[in-house]
């Protein structure tokens, strides 16, 4: 609810000359705020002229794009993917495997198509982040960047666990600690573009 209301406020600020908002989490402008500024003459556009309280506020400068810049939301679960599509928000995905991404791409396509009442092409409105390191050989990529990538993912997965790295329906063997399986070989085949130019190109086409 907080995110949805934040988005509502943002769109108002971008698209209206002066705006007000009274919601569950936010109220703009602050109630009964008296406005007095020598360089900003009073105006009924944004003030109650009887008591000099603000009725509306504005932002400057306004966005260059009309009605506003494209909005992108980082998503993971199907619920957030469908919510973004239903609100005509582009999405950004990161860690999931190709098999998992295909399900997520389809979910976004279907929800966006339903919202716009047309067939939205698969992949439209979706951005994908992938970690990449290109080298002359596969061994060189591993030697120069592999350890750093694993350490980075250990930091990320400390809270998240390994669920985002798994294929749909995949079961991982039980381990003493939740990140015992997290190594270069585990990551590389799932979502890393580390290797020769040819390898990276093939993975992109995948």
Question: Regions from the language model: what does each represent?
Answer:
Residues 74-105:
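A conserved active-site cap/scaffold subdomain adjacent to cofactor or substrate pockets
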Residues 71-74, 89-93, 124-131:
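Hydrophobic faces of well-ordered beta-strands that scaffold small-molecule active sites
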Residues 70-71, 193:
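A generic secondary-structure micro-motif detector
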Residues 2-62, 99-205:
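An alpha-helical appendage that flanks or caps ligand/catalytic pockets
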Residues 63-70:
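A local structural motif
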């Amino acid at each position: 609810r907080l995110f949805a209301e934040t988005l509502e406020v943002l769109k108002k600020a971008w698209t209206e000359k002066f705006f007000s908002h009274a919601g569950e989490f936010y109220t703009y402008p602050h109630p009964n705020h008296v406005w007095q500024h020598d360089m900003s003459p009073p105006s009924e556009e944004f003030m109650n002229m009887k008591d000099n309280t603000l009725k509306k506020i504005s932002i400057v400068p306004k966005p260059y794009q009309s009605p506003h810049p494209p909005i992108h939301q980082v998503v993971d679960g199907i619920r957030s993917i469908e919510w973004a599509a239903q609100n005509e928000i582009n999405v950004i995905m990161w860690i999931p495997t190709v098999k998992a991404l295909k399900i997520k791409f389809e979910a976004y396509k279907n929800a966006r198509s339903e919202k716009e009442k047309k067939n939205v092409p698969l992949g439209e409105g979706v951005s994908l982040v992938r970690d990449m390191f290109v080298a002359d050989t596969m061994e060189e990529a591993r030697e120069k960047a592999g350890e750093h990538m694993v350490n980075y993912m250990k930091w990320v997965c400390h809270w998240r666990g390994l669920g985002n790295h798994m294929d749909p329906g995949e079961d991982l063997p039980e381990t003493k600690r939740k990140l015992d399986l997290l190594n270069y070989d585990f990551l590389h085949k799932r979502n890393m573009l580390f290797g020769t130019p040819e390898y990276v190109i093939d993975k992109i086409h995948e």
